[in-house]
């Protein structure tokens, strides 16, 4: 199995978590618990294990069975791998018991590079796209039965594709001929026949493949649930770092951070500043990859990491 994967913003993500006040606090009796929401190929997890004390514990999650098999090779008693989405991490830890959480929302290089996974329009393979190959419909199965209006909605909403209607119409037309796309290259060719204008440096199929991957794996729904679960699990003073790779993800993270970093007071209500309820989060900042990292790993170019810290006295 190809396990080569270069994690994005590796040093920055680890620093963002371990520089939080809880982990920096020197207390021999305290057992640090950190969650890596997407194990991938273990880059962030391994870096966290190297940076934390021997008494610490790192819990990683992943839906991908290939990632789980890689994780099971790690021989470190401080490490636990969970075959589940980070959306459900609050089922595996108690409220306010975690000292730091990292969510890396990017698809891993092996997932893209291994043709049989069906994520890449550049490699011939079955049109699968499922992170967890034990669950749900493949992209091909869904395209074979979804109404044209639903295909249009998915491609437009999750791919921000302006030719969504034309692409969906072409897919359904092929389906009616008994030629519904079954492979990655069949779908990519079909999209290319419809999308006549291409953005600089971008394949015509890029947005459609992104849309189907996000939809098939419920990525945005998982992100929304995961952010809520993270806020519940973090101790006051603990940090949450989220690395996103496209505007849909980043918008959700940004809006979540902003919504929980301010306190809504009814207009006209006389409240003194010292009596204001405490907001849940303090926004620490955002980080983008350096030019050097992008030159060494072009897949990092669209990444952005946002970091927030749970306030002392914040509501659970």
Swiss-Prot record:
Organism, scientific name: Polynucleobacter asymbioticus (strain DSM 18221 / CIP 109841 / QLW-P1DMWA-1)
Residues reported in the UniProt entry to bind S-adenosyl-L-methionine: 42-44, 62, 86, 104, 111
One Gene Ontology cellular component: cytoplasm
Alphabetized UniProt keyword annotations: Cytoplasm, Methyltransferase, rRNA processing, S-adenosyl-L-methionine, Transferase
GO biological process, one term: rRNA base methylation
Underlying gene: rsmH
Location(s) in or outside the cell: Cytoplasm
Protein's UniProt name: Ribosomal RNA small subunit methyltransferase H
GO molecular function: rRNA (cytosine-N4-)-methyltransferase activity
Taxonomic superkingdom: Bacteria
Lineage: Bacteria, Pseudomonadati, Pseudomonadota, Betaproteobacteria, Burkholderiales
Keyword Transferase set for record: yes
């Amino acid at each position: 199995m190809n396990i080569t994967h270069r994690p994005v913003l590796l040093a920055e993500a680890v620093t963002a978590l371990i520089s939080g006040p809880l982990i920096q606090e020197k207390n021999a009796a305290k057992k640090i618990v950190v969650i890596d929401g997407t194990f991938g190929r273990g880059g962030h997890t391994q870096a966290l294990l190297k940076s934390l004390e021997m008494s610490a514990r790192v819990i990683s999650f992943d839906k991908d069975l290939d990632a789980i098999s890689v994780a099971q090779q790690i021989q470190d008693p401080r490490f636990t791998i969970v075959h589940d989405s980070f959306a459900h991490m609050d089922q595996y830890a108690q409220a306010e018991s975690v000292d730091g959480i990292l969510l890396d929302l990017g698809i891993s290089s092996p997932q893209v590079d291994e043709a049989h996974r069906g994520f890449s329009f550049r490699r011939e393979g079955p049109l699968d796209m499922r992170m967890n190959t034990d669950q749900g419909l493949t992209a091909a199965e869904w395209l074979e039965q979804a109404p044209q209006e639903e295909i249009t909605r998915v491609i437009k909403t999750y791919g921000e594709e302006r030719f969504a209607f034309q692409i969906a119409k072409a897919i359904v037309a092929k389906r009616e001929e008994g030629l519904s796309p079954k492979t990655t290259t069949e779908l990519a060719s079909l999209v290319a026949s419809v999308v006549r204008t291409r953005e600089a440096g971008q394949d015509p199929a890029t947005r459609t493949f992104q849309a189907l991957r996000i939809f098939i794996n419920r990525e945005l729904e998982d992100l929304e649930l995961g952010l809520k679960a993270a806020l519940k699990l973090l101790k006051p003073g603990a940090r949450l770092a989220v690395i996103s790779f496209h505007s849909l993800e980043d918008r959700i993270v940004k809006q979540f951070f902003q919504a929980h970093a301010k306190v809504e007071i009814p207009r006209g209500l006389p409240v003194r500043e010292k009596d204001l309820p405490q907001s849940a989060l303090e926004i620490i900042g955002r980080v983008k990859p350096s030019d050097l990292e992008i030159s060494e790993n072009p897949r990092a170019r669209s990444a952005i990491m946002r970091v927030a810290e749970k306030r002392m006295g914040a509501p659970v």
